[in-house]
Regions:
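Feature captures hydrophobic
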Residues: 1-109
Length: 109
């Protein structure tokens, strides 16, 4: 089995977005991922849609900081985001309300 990379995760995330759970949720989320395959990615949530890209987003409401491998595990359902946060594997800066809702907006592959 080939290793899943953050590029693959972010390319697919909009297809896993559950607009029915989003309601009026909106925000710009920045991801700062370190280690092998690390880099910066973003997700914009607005009007019941999500779009993703590589690089930095303007005016992030939320920044998530993690090792790239750990984030891939979170995104693919192998690591619980709350457990990752509590153990220090996931750091959160910004809108905690958006952070708490974020994981529920995307179904797991």
């Amino acid at each position: 089995m080939t290793e899943v990379t953050p590029d693959q995760v972010f390319k697919e995330m909009p297809t896993y977005f559950q607009s029915e759970k989003a309601g009026s949720t909106k925000g710009n989320v920045q991801f700062d991922l370190s280690g092998d395959n690390g880099g910066k990615w973003w997700i914009k949530i607005a009007e019941g849609k999500a779009e993703a890209g590589k690089g930095e987003v303007e005016s992030p409401n939320l920044t998530l900081i993690a090792d790239a491998g750990d984030y891939v595990k979170i995104a693919t359902g192998q690591l619980d985001p709350t457990a990752a946060f509590m153990s220090g594997k996931l750091k959160i800066k910004g809108d905690m309300g958006l952070a708490m809702k974020f994981a529920s907006l995307f179904r797991r592959p």
